[in-house]
Design a protein with these regions (language model features):
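OB-fold and OB-like single-stranded nucleic-acid-recognition modules
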Residues: 1-211, 327
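Basic, amphipathic alpha-helical bundle interface domains used for macromolecular binding and assembly
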Residues: 356, 361, 369, 391, ...
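Short, mixed-charge aromatic SLiMs
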Residues: 251-267, 492-516, 603-609
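Intrinsically disordered, low-complexity regions enriched in proline, serine, glycine
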Residues: 166-169, 370-371, 489, 591
Length: 611
């Protein structure tokens, strides 16, 4: 079959019997794993007769003296599979079968390299489940120069054949074209819509609300502008950001935790499906090997098979029902999410890039509602991932409670969003390099000042960490710059302004101070408790400095009231006042039998001050 005659077929349809031994095109195939072995196999075999005493009329008998009679056989693609992992005698056996003569011997004249690969269809629910297959398929890629790389997407020209030895199906691939994220052909007219919205809005809420109203007919979910804004900003986030001579990660890691039936997953699924960019996995039936990667047996070799995060490098992945992932699995993702690379050191070693924008959606692990947690959404988030290091990896954490939306007004679904400009905008964001992002000295100073004030207001917890606040602000600022159409086509530059940084701060405060999130209340209580602890420590240190003998009492597990007066050698009134102050501050509590029990803090300070 000629190259031009191949037809586009889905992976499912390629398995119909009518497509056996037929060259077809398989588009958007993701290479999940590659075998490290390289095979070099003959594609043409010259036939030689090894029987000098043969007197039968045969063209091979004259080929030694008459080269024009030489017989060269093109090896059938199916037979290449037979030659793999076989001795040279397999080639002789093949020719003897073709000629029906035991005297024929093979002499290879042309060769091709072959690489065993594991691949799957890269389509998720975007193209409809009935036409997509998520199971791994086995292939053999024929090449002369460069091998295929794992985690990349390709358009294959392939033929499904059966292995003559085992009858197992393989896809023999003669041509593979890499499908990279192309730099969009974007114009000033296309960017103008985003620029006009960005210029007209003075607050982050106004910008998000205007885009939300534009998308409302497509999403059909009301009352969730903060969630829409988070999805939009995650899509608009860049890959790398220049900062102080180095490069920071630019892709956003967003988490939404909420009650069931609040539309959080539905909104994200509709957005991903409409845009047609990004992958999807369900955490309920996924483990670490499916998210990061693992090793798989392929013939007599072990092959690294990469998971959903590295397979969506420089793209976006939505993890739905994330509560299905174990805490240990999420902890294992920590290094990957911060560095943008995956390293597997198992039976075989493998490395892959994983600069993947992540959208996590989850219900509370315990099945309770957000309103049942003391700290509302933040309490449910702490239950979801109790390790502070992993909590800090999330750039945005949002809540979606039932009580957030009172009444649904209904949506006019007659209009649809114009997807072309949005797809071009997201492709632009995903392909921008760190050299194209321009941050002036004035903006850098404003970022530092904003980070400092934000840390004073909301610092102390895992979601606003003092030394890393500027990184979170920069990621959100660059995403807002993209959403505002601030890309200069003439100079190929994304200019960051103080307005974008202000929008980033506003959005962070909006999500964290939301009543159903409860993070602002948690931080205020945390800071009050910290201040109280500091005051108590100062009070106890002063008390010990004035009455050194009190250390003997405070290091005891309990003591009687009269012992306080006797050991300190003070009047009863003064003794009562000191004990009253300690009880009021929560440093001393009454026990059974007229005894008093010192608080742990009190005992710690007393022990620290022992010489």
């Amino acid at each position: 079959q000629a190259m031009g005659e191949t037809q586009d077929v889905s992976l499912v349809r390629s398995e119909f019997t009518e497509n056996l031994n037929t060259w077809i095109k398989l588009n958007n195939m993701s290479v999940v794993g590659v075998e490290p072995k390289i095979y070099t196999l003959p594609t043409k075999l010259k036939c030689i007769c090894r029987n000098s005493k043969c007197n039968k009329p045969c063209p091979l008998a004259f080929s030694a003296t008459n080269p024009e009679f030489a017989q060269v056989v093109d090896v059938d693609p199916r037979q290449l599979l037979r030659f793999m992992d076989s001795a040279d005698s397999a080639q002789d056996s093949y020719l003897r079968q073709v000629f029906g003569c035991k005297s024929v011997q093979a002499e290879p004249t042309d060769f091709i390299n072959c690489q065993k690969i594991i691949f799957q269809e890269s389509a998720s629910f975007i193209d409809g489940l009935e036409e997509a297959s998520f199971e791994n398929r086995y292939g053999v890629y024929m090449y002369t120069d460069y091998r295929l790389s794992a985690t990349l997407k390709y358009n294959f020209e392939a033929c499904r054949v059966t292995n003559p030895s085992t009858q197992q199906n393989y896809y023999l691939i003669r041509d593979a074209e890499c499908v990279s994220v192309p730099r969009p052909d974007i114009s000033e007219e296309l960017l103008q819509h985003f620029k006009s919205v960005g210029d007209s809005c003075e607050t982050a809420r106004a910008l998000v609300q205007q885009y939300y109203e534009e998308w409302m007919p497509e999403l059909a979910i009301e009352g969730r502008p903060d969630l829409f804004g988070a999805i939009l900003l995650t899509y608009c986030s860049v890959t790398e950001i220049p900062w102080q001579g180095g490069v920071l990660k630019g892709w956003l890691d967003t988490m939404c935790i909420g009650d069931t039936r609040t539309g959080k997953s539905q909104m994200a699924q509709k957005f991903v499906k409409a845009v047609g960019m990004g992958g999807y996995i369900n955490g309920e039936n996924a483990r670490r090997t499916g998210v990061i990667g693992g090793v798989q047996r392929f013939g007599d070799s072990w092959v690294v098979t990469w998971g959903a995060i590295p397979m969506n490098d420089r793209g976006l992945l939505m993890i739905d029902e994330a509560s299905g992932l174990e805490v240990e699995d999420i902890k294992d993702l920590s290094s990957t999410r911060s560095s943008g690379a995956v390293t597997l050191n198992k039976i075989v070693k493998g490395e892959a890039r994983a600069r993947t924008r992540l959208l996590w959606f989850s219900n509370p692990r315990s099945g309770r509602n957000l309103s049942d947690f003391y700290w509302r959404g933040f309490g449910a988030f702490q239950e979801f991932i109790p390790v502070m290091e992993d909590q800090a990896r999330y750039d945005l954490v949002l809540s979606a409670a039932r009580e957030d939306v009172d009444i649904l007004n209904g949506i006019d679904v007659e209009t649809h969003v114009n997807l072309g400009p949005w797809q071009a905008l997201f492709s632009l964001a995903w392909s921008i390099t760190s050299e194209e992002i321009k941050i002036s000295k004035e903006v850098k100073q404003y970022v530092r000042e904003t980070a400092k004030s934000l840390n004073e207001a909301l610092g102390g917890g895992p979601l606003v960490v003092g030394v890393a606040v500027h990184e979170k602000l920069l990621r959100l600022s660059c995403a807002f710059a993209i959403a505002c159409g601030a890309y200069d086509l003439k100079n190929s530059a994304l200019e960051l302004t103080t307005k974008h940084v202000r929008f980033a701060r506003e959005f962070l405060e909006w999500t964290l101070n939301k009543p159903s999130m409860g993070y602002g209340d948690y931080i205020r209580e945390f800071k009050r408790a910290q201040q109280k602890r500091a005051d108590n420590m100062q009070f106890v240190r002063t008390l010990i400095a004035v009455h050194p003998a009190i250390k003997a009492l405070l290091t005891a597990t309990s003591f009687k009231g009269y012992q306080f007066q006797e050991i300190l050698g003070i009047e009863k009134n003064e003794s009562s006042k000191i004990m009253s102050d300690l009880i009021t501050r929560g440093l001393l509590r009454p026990g059974s039998g007229a005894s008093y029990i010192p608080d742990k803090l009190l005992m710690e300070i007393a022990k620290q001050m022992e010489v």
